[in-house]
């Protein structure tokens, strides 16, 4: 199993510029269950982080976990009955978004996924947990794919599903009303919603009908969509958003190098976020309202490590 992020409204187009005023401090956090493959995907305002270890290749299932400061104890987050679970987001009440699979077949010989995945939210119930199925009923195709990727403090989640033709559709899901709302962007061929803040602003990514990939932020009403693309990049994806509208994600430059990114609303600038050990690339997946970031990087040996970033 792997994250299937994509390999009309009034529109605001944001030109991006680089900035160097930010200082980042990087901390590597790896679950010892597999120190060769960890990804940190979400963080709340208490600094509690969710992620997973295991590449998803056959025999190396994704095992979700939660970890709180001082970041020494990893608590499993596994959907009941699952073989694999990726814990993807967490709000301040401790609700955790995830997607899970009943199998661990790994990709086929052509690299295509064979493991179906389904969206869910883990909810604290007393000293135990309940799991809410968030899989969009429009999910179709083989294998089925629905991924719930983020949740705000009003318990509205964001994610995407694949239709019978393999096209991705972004959505939000309100846990209180069990209502799905599709995210639509004019001119987009495929859409994935990846994060949502307490203002119900949604971030994500889309491909145009010509195959170009952009990040986006959509306001709560859906009437304004701001499109983001780092100049000269081949791909830009936005994966997390906080209440100030600061977004994080990654871009692929003209040399096919992957860089984490952090967007500063006050200046309109992109700031690259590159872990000094991430010679194989850096991705930022989550941001909280204190400006703490989480993600992962690939080292010189090809191992993937979880990453916590503080911003000064």
Regions of interest found by a model, annotated:
Residues 3-4, 20-312:
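Residue-level hotspots at or immediately adjacent to binding/recognition sites across diverse folds
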């Amino acid at each position: 199993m792997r994250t299937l992020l994509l390999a009309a409204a009034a529109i605001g187009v944001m030109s991006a510029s680089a900035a160097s005023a930010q200082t980042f401090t990087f901390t590597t956090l790896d679950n010892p269950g597999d120190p060769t493959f960890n990804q940190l995907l979400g963080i709340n305002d208490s600094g509690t982080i969710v992620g997973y270890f295991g590449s998803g290749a056959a025999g190396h299932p994704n095992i979700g976990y939660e970890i709180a400061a001082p970041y020494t104890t990893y608590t499993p987050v596994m959907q009941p009955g699952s073989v694999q679970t990726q814990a993807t987001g967490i709000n301040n009440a401790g609700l955790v978004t995830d997607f899970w699979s009943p199998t661990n077949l790994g990709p086929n010989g052509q690299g295509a996924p064979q493991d179906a995945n389904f969206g869910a939210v883990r909810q604290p119930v007393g000293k135990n947990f309940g799991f809410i199925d968030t899989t969009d009923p429009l999910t179709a195709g083989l294998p089925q794919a629905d991924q719930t990727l983020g949740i705000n403090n009003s318990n509205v989640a964001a994610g995407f599903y694949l239709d019978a033709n393999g096209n991705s559709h972004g959505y939000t899901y309100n846990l209180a009303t069990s209502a799905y709302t599709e995210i639509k962007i004019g001119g987009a061929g495929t859409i994935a919603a990846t994060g949502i803040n307490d203002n119900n602003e949604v971030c994500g990514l889309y491909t145009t009908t010509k195959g170009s990939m952009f990040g986006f932020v959509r306001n709560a009403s859906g009437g304004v969509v701001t499109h983001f693309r780092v100049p000269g990049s081949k791909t830009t994806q936005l994966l997390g958003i906080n209440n100030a509208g600061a977004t994080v994600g990654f871009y692929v430059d003209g040399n096919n190098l992957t860089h984490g990114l952090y967007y500063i609303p006050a200046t309109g600038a992109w700031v690259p976020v590159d872990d000094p050990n991430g010679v194989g690339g850096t991705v930022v997946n989550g941001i909280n309202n204190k400006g703490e970031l989480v993600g992962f990087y690939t080292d010189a040996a090809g191992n993937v490590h979880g990453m916590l970033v503080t911003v000064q």
